Amino acid sequence: MIDRYKHQQLRIGSVSPQQISAWANKILPNGEIVGEVTKPYTFHYKTNKPEKDGLFCERIFGPIKSGICACGNYRVIGNEKEDPKFCEQCGVEFVDSRIRRYQMGYIKLACPVTHVWYLKRLPSYIASLLDKPLKELEGLVYCDFSFARPIAKKPTFLRLRGSFESEIQSRKYSIPLFFTTQDFDTFRNREISTGAGAIKEQLADPDLRIITDHSLVEWKELGEEGSADGNEWEDRKIGRRKDFLVRRMELAKHFIRTNVEPERMVLCLLPVLPPELRPIIQIDGGKPMSSDINELYRRVIYRNNTLTDPLTTSRSTPGESVMCQEKLVQEAVDTLLDNGIRGQPMRDGHNKVYKSFSDVIEGKEGRFRETLLGKRVDYSGRSVIVVGPSLSLHRCGLPREIAIELFQTFVIRGLIRQHVASNIGIAKSKIREKEPIVWEILQEVMQGHPVLLNRAPTLHRLGIQAFQPILVEGRAICLHPLVRKGFNADFDGDQMAVHVPLSLEAQAEARLLMFSHMNLLSPAIGDPISVPTQDMLIGLYILTIGNRRGICSNRYNPCNRRNYQNETVDYNKYTKEKEPYFCSSYDALGAYRQKRINLDSPLWLRWRLDQRVIASREVPIEVQYESLGTYHEIYGHYLIVRSVKKEILCIYIRTTVGHISFYREIEEAIQGFCRAYLYDT
């Protein structure tokens, strides 16, 4: 529906019988009104056409084929000059067949039926509004007992029985004869009330405002009694009663605010869903497969017609038989709306539980959550996230299997433009065969197209961010660990969805506002949100720990160098290993990749003279002289090579490969920041 402010919204609630009939009724040119489903049939077994006035009737729900009636006549849809709009023979309207997705019908119930959601769901709305026990109302609804209506100056049951005794002297046969006459129906309807009709009468009588006022007065009185009496049992009883009164007042105010009549909780007309929402399809071998709701509708129509026959005919029917049939109609409608709510669910011939209307709409796979609220969208995928430590902050790794599906239309367009494929079919076959040209075009497409990553629940705007995708091996999405906190995700099996923005506006928004390197601060408090996590800090610690004892320890001892404190060393096989010297960090990293040194192995790295590492008052630990007159001054963490004239020739610092890697990463990050700053200014 659309309100006065033109906001589209969906409201779920009870509907009046007039509204139900307005949804379904159509007036034919001959004045006949169609919309009521009276027959429990679906398709004719010979012609395979919908039965007239059945659950798939074309007069009620529209044609199966657009513009073709049940007779086979054809009219152009949308041509107003074509007259008439309905077929004169079969009464089918010449419209699009998509009308069968929303055109409804209805079943006119022979007796009122209580809506089981309002009766059996806890808390029971009917029990709350009438202030009666639920078991008492259930006994009344299912005709287990009845109550007498207030009468005034009308013949009672005893007086009527006396009139029969005057005609038939034998009291033994007078009462049974009275219960089998047609006059008993009039008497029962006037003085005895049972079934859902009795509930409807009680819901129509009270004034909602009076209910609200009386409940408020009682709630205040109970509050005073609870404060005066100190009995714990009585206090609990009063507390439960006060909670019930609050629910009753809220329910009455809701009916007043929404202008809904409480008697609508009792059904007189049962809506019939459009046929496309409860289809009958043919599987392999021509065997039909029907929705469970069709079988439940047929059950309702069968029992309703069985009850309608004795009520419309002139012959007399025992009252107990009528009450029993009303109970069967009530149970059939209950099964249609919510199978199993009253105990054992109804099953088919294969002992499979029928799927009722409640089962269709509720739950994760229901109509609302699957197709309306959380429905799946095109150009999207989902997979587990893992750490991508080599990724940049604004990049994410997409598996090839996901990427080729997300960007398949773009790849097809690229194959056709490069004349690799002449049509869409050939392009799809090349994609299925995974030819090398496909991955090349995919790389080109992904370079200029950002993707959106989302982790549910999206509680703030950082729950969905944009990234530049790159192809990775495997089946998991790779993510930089620093963006984890914004998504509130963990790398322990969490899943994230990936979406492709299609329009230029969406792509511009993703690049300008949603990229991860542009969302470094929390939108709530302004604190940095991309901060190192504990595992990152531990990794940096292991990377830079090196030899904590420094040069004063036995630097040639392998157990000190590798920090294996619990490892036993065989001193008989001990050999003195000299710490290597490297002219540049590239040489040191190359030696590490060749596995000539370890990550924490101490080494000497040549340092530039313009970067000072010399402490003015530091005394060398050791001085080593060479034959040519040069000498080495060894300090705690560096070494100076001097000439004969005491000039500094070069400087070496004592470090590890881990320190070198960490230093280079920081240096590159600072240089990149400076370049970006200069570019912006």
Curated annotation (Swiss-Prot):
Could you confirm whether the keyword Magnesium appears in this record? yes
Q: Which Gene3D superfamilies match?
A: 1.10.40.90, 2.40.40.20, RNA polymerase II, clamp domain, RNA polymerase Rpb1, domain 3
Q: GO:BP terms for this protein? A: DNA-templated transcription
Give binding positions for Zn(2+): C69, C71, C87, C90
* Zinc among keywords: yes
Q: How is the cofactor bound?
A: Binds 1 Mg(2+) ion per subunit. Binds 1 Zn(2+) ion per subunit.
State the source organism's domain of life. Answer: Eukaryota
Q: Which SUPFAM superfamilies match?
A: beta and beta-prime subunits of DNA dependent RNA-polymerase (SSF64484)
Give the keywords, sorted. Chloroplast, DNA-directed RNA polymerase, Magnesium, Metal-binding, Nucleotidyltransferase, Plastid, Transcription, Transferase, Zinc
Name the GO cellular-component terms. Answer: chloroplast; DNA-directed RNA polymerase complex; mitochondrion
Q: One of this protein's Pfam families, by short name?
A: RNA_pol_Rpb1_2
Q: Known catalysed reaction(s)? A: RNA(n) + a ribonucleoside 5'-triphosphate = RNA(n+1) + diphosphate
> What does the UniProt function comment say about this protein?
DNA-dependent RNA polymerase catalyzes the transcription of DNA into RNA using the four ribonucleoside triphosphates as substrates.
Which PANTHER family does the entry mention? Answer: DNA-DIRECTED RNA POLYMERASE, DNA-DIRECTED RNA POLYMERASE SUBUNIT BETA
Membership in a protein family? Belongs to the RNA polymerase beta' chain family. RpoC1 subfamily.
| Protein name, UniProt field | DNA-directed RNA polymerase subunit beta'
Species for this entry:
Liriodendron tulipifera (Tuliptree)
